[in-house]
Amino acid sequence: MAQADMVRISVCYARPDSVFLKEFDVLQGTTIAAAIVSSGVQQVCPEIDPSTMRVGIYGKLKTPDTVVRTGDRVEIYRALTADPKLARRRRVQKTRESGTREGQKWLRGGA
């Protein structure tokens, strides 16, 4: 197999306690789904379900059938653990209740 038939990519998956990052060569025309399987990430992180997890390349969402190119970093995204709007409301409420100057600013309407 000629080197020209191969592309160098990396596969990344982050957990709260660790990161899986592997750089390797795959054949041209390999899809994101095939690259994930080839990386071995599912043996290290068994919670990954390719049929339900969202994937992307450098922070841009892609479909699993997208073909990878040289230099791509395939990212596997975890589901959100908290609703961002609800988390912000809780932070604001906590700041308001703290009695600090910043908390008082929230109560006065930002002045």
Curated annotation (Swiss-Prot):
Q: Name one Pfam family in it.
A: Ub-RnfH
Which residue ranges have biased composition labelled Basic and acidic residues?
94-105
Q: Where is this region: Disordered?
A: 88-111
Secretion signal, residue range per the UniProt entry = none
Q: Which InterPro entries match?
A: Mopterin_synth/thiamin_S_b, RnfH, RnfH_sf
Concerning SUPFAM superfamilies, the annotation shows: MoaD/ThiS
PANTHER family under this entry? UPF0125 PROTEIN RATB
State the family named in the UniProt similarity comment for this chain: Belongs to the UPF0125 (RnfH) family.
Official protein name in the record: Protein RnfH
